[in-house]
Amino acid sequence: MSEKKEEVKNATVKVTVKLPKEDNHSHNTKHLKKTQSSKNNDISFEIGKESKIQTVLDVLAMIPSSKYLTNVGLKTIEGDSQLSDEMSIKEIVGEKSELKLQLILKPYSAREALKHVITVRDFIGFAQETSDGLSEFAISTGSSFSSLPLGPIKERSKQEEKDEKSDPEEKKNTFKDVTDEEKLKFNEMVHEVFSSFKNSSINKLLTSESNIITPCVRSLSFAPYNPVPPFYRSKGHLFYLQIVTLEGESFYITAIPSGFYVNKSNSTKFDPSPKENTDENAHSSLIYYSLFDLIASRSKKFISHVQAFEKKLSALDSTSYVRPSNTFLHKPWFVSSLPPNNPDYLRLQTAALDTTPERNFNDEFQAIKDLTTSTLQDRIEMERLFSKVVHEFSVTAASGAMSIFYSDFVAMNPESPTRDQIFLKDNIFYSYVSDVSGNYEGKGGDEAAIAASNQDLKTINILNRLHMHEVRYLLTTVVEFAGRRILAQTPVPGLLATMGNKIVKDANTGEEVTEDFVNDINVKYGLDEGLGKIVYDADFDSVLEKKFVKAFHLKKHKVNGTELAFSSQSKGIVGFDKRRYILDLANTYPLDINFARQNFDNIEETGNRYPHRQTLLRPELVEKWWNNKVEKEGVEFEKAYEENLFSYNPDAYQVEGIEDANVDEMSNYLQKEVIPSVIQDYLSGNLSTPYNGEHLADTLHKNGINMRYLGKIIELSQKELDSQIVHYEQNLKAVEQDNKEYEDWEKSYLQKIENMIKERQAKINKLVQEGKEVPKELTEDLKLNDEEIKKPTDGKPVVVAYDELVPLIKISELEIVSRSLKHVLKDLSKDVPVFLVPSLVAYVFNMLVGINYNADPKPEPVDEFYPVNKCSFAKLTRSELLEAVSKQAFLRFRHQLPSNWIEAYMENPFTLIRSVSYKFGIQLLNKEYFFTREQLESYKQSLDKKIRNKFVEPPTTFSLSDLTIIPRVKFSEYTSSVSEEFWAQGASMINEDKQSALTLLAQSITVLEDVNNILHPAVAEKYLSLSAIYNKLALYPEAIAFCRKACTIYERVSGIDSFEMMRALTNLAILEFSNESPYNATVVYNRLAEILKVYELPKIHHPAPTSIFNHLEQLALGVQDTKLAIEVLGQLSSYVVELEGKDSLAYGYTESRLGNLFAALKDFHRALEHITVTQGIFTKQLGMNHTHSAQSRQWVNGLSSLIMDLKQKKQLAQDQMSTTGSNSAGHKKTNHRQKKDDVKPELANKSVDELLTFIEGDSSNSKSKNKTNNKKKHGKK
């Protein structure tokens, strides 16, 4: 790692690039001003010596003065020849620290001119930020985070930092640098949060902003006069364009090697010759090297729009509008509106004119893996290309799969049934995921094959990180659409090729027949399905042993006498390119044998079995178990890895007669240790309470738990909850008994003290009567036995972990229901024509949750060629649908849903619909949906009278016109190992060398952005982590900037309502709090409140709402607005009462805090009201002798006395007004003595606490502040 650190500090070179002089290639006209594409100046920047010339060109492609020059090269100032793009800077400069280069304009070819046109289009607003590789099949929405009314990040002054260090306690309590204007805005925003918790709607939350990027011309496309006629093609004409400016002018352009010019063509006449410019300011040359300059010369509005456009972008973080290159944008389930499908011929035309040769993704992928990685720059370049080709394969595969789903491809075997058909296009092999070969017969058939395709992809994800050169694998993507699933893979080179054929005579008939030559590309190692046996190859075996076996902890074993290093279902093939490929890697992981036995093997009735036996353990579980074994056995990690200790046999319990104790142990480890420990982690707060099903799945998967254990999660969580409730109720009874005992003890102890006092007084009286001196011991305090006194206890309250367990149970149930419903939809739709699936989905949704609006919904017709009423789903009844969901819930999750399970989702159906939509692939239109007739009538009354009269009532809640079906793409993932290494080193040295550590962390993110592009989930995760590190270092402004960037990325790639976004928003709010920006923090809390409300998380006891209220109270106190803090606690108190009632400890704690705040305002009557409430709660829940109960009594007594004292003083002041000054003074004196006498009631009537105070002379606690233990969250009882 020290070498890497040196490479980070590698010397940079100052590069100066001289742009071309003004001539016909660059028109420095008045109208171009600052937006001209190239100026007669130099561009300078720093770049690493290890960088290549291509990197310099990449930088120039983003600089305003050169970004419109796309067909260029570079040469040194002294040299004549163009430098190779792959040449490194170091090769050119040697030991020098400066490099001067000249930009060379190259003549256009049709290909380069097309590239230039597309680049210009992108820069002038045709490349919308909502487009990605799936835009043809699904809708993405823009960012709304950038429209949040957040103020600028507050910079901390050195004096503030100094004050914070010198007086951290003061810093914690109050904010020093908050203006009156911000306080006012903060107050208003707090009230918006209150409103959001009550009135937020799904329609408002998921209304996306209009696109940030909009075109600066009306249209730019190829003219209908293409292709170029032969007469002009030979004269250099490349193609013709047609442009319509914002002024409405339409003109035609000819592209030639030296650039572009306006020609004489119009809509009815073709004349590609140059059109003379009659403008007085016209230039001598009519040819523009840059298309941008040509448009600018013809349109004044174009320049102003480009300036406004660039100004708008400059005000935003680039993450809010940059297009993704290595990932897909989030596809929300609720889309604001259908995207405008404006005429843009170029979208279709570019495909026709594209001269790029057909890609061979496998060749590209394998060539990238062969690249040299001797230097850091080489490694980064390899990873960048790797990530790029993996994503581009997924895009192409998804597009190809969709063509198959829509029957636009012809199969290689068209006569076969649909599920057996295979396809080959663009060197990608497609097949429906089913058990065509019969490998999973007896194990679940198609269901097992579907599970195996997911498991195969998991293996490939791990292989992506291993960088094995001697073992190769295939690019793989899985596409699901409308209940169907297609597997797309790059084929092994030569495997599908025909080796030619020969004509031979049939031995029986004598007829001549054609016979194919045998393909010599076949299985060398593992399962040969053609031969029906396991084959062995020593070379293949030795290669697998080097890294593959160790990485997966596989044990070498024998199957039918043949030795194998991996599963007997996997294959090893030597391709035509002589590389070794491994395929069918699903069974690389061990079987979860306990689950298989319990839910498949030992279930005699097939209908109650788990759908398949392909129940493998997750890779995270295997790693967790292996690391646990290494630690328990006390073996060094390196030794365990190199010697392949604690390995397992992947064929154990898969092949008859093969067993493995480690496989049994892993299965036991999952069920008996991991699952219970995860529930305990939720209880202890080590794991965040899930926001939604995706959050839960992410947490379970990271801990190695399969989703088939959701039923087990609910079972254990409910058992824990029931146990806690029983314990809580038992404790209440015990407290009640303790209170009785305490009252009895108090009464007897008071009586004892009174007797002691009487005895002492009798002795004193006797001595006085006898005229004797009273001994000192009779005038001193009573000597009491401390052991007899029951002092207040501070025992831990017995609470029920509702906050942790109820959301876990409810979200697990929601996930079971939505996943079960997804399987029902898949079963219903897999044999239905694709075009009918929207009708099917609308029908199912109407039956599920629209029954109170229309009790008898019917499926809508789509096309007369596909009559809906003849489909099986049209005969489905609601009871059958509900029963089908319940059956899937039991089969797949071993969980029995209650008979009325649907009722839980009828009040807010969108919670269920959202979850199902993400899983099946559904996008709904953002509009008003009516689930009851009352909702409809209410909506109609809210309309303007004119609109109401024209309003047409929808026949059902959902219509097929409200939704679309979209593909769900499962693709292999890749992350940069170089970035991870920089991050690990930076994180490890943060305490020793902060500056170097932060530099390494920043370098890690820079590398990751280079490899994956800035718009990527992995980049967002790193920014969020970096934000947390800066927060720990008290560098709050920087932490906020990083966290805001993470929020923007997460919103675009994960969604506004994703758990990643909610987690990032929560962090951001806390950071804004730490930076003393109460308004900004509250803006973020308001967005969180909206999300929490629309998905009804407050109703399932989620702790997030309470956390928000608690932070809002602290913010209010920070700006010293006690009245606002009281309002916040009032809202919290109402929320707690709604969830738990007025007997809960949470309510008592909140009332106690309210009492304190009212006391601070000197509103002692209100303070007494709230503190009095706590006395009964604490006594019932904690016991009379608990510290909180004792303090509450002291508060009540103290406040009561204080109120009485103030009342007496007020009365005294009134009396003084009616008397003379002297009498007043005398009266006051008498009254004061009277008060002293009055506040000493009979000792027998005092409580033990009061009595002790009296005897011991300790009055310091009479106004003790009730500091309640507020560590427990609101969900505790």
Curated annotation (Swiss-Prot):
Gene Ontology MF term list: mRNA binding; RNA binding
Predominant localisation class: cytoplasm
SUPFAM superfamilies, per the entry: Hypothetical protein c14orf129, hspc210, TPR-like
UniProt repeat feature TPR, residue ranges: 704-738, 1020-1053, 1148-1181
InterPro entries (alphabetical): CLU-central, CLU_dom, CLU_N, CLU_prot, GSKIP_dom_sf, TPR-like_helical_dom_sf
Domain annotation Clu: ranges: 339-596
Keywords, alphabetical: Cytoplasm, Phosphoprotein, Repeat, TPR repeat
Gene3D superfamilies noted in UniProt: Tetratricopeptide repeat domain
Cellular compartments annotated: Cytoplasm
General remark: Present with 17000 molecules/cell in log phase SD medium.
Role played: mRNA-binding protein involved in proper cytoplasmic distribution of mitochondria.
Record's protein name: Clustered mitochondria protein 1
UniProt source species: Saccharomyces cerevisiae (strain ATCC 204508 / S288c) (Baker's yeast)
Gene field: CLU1
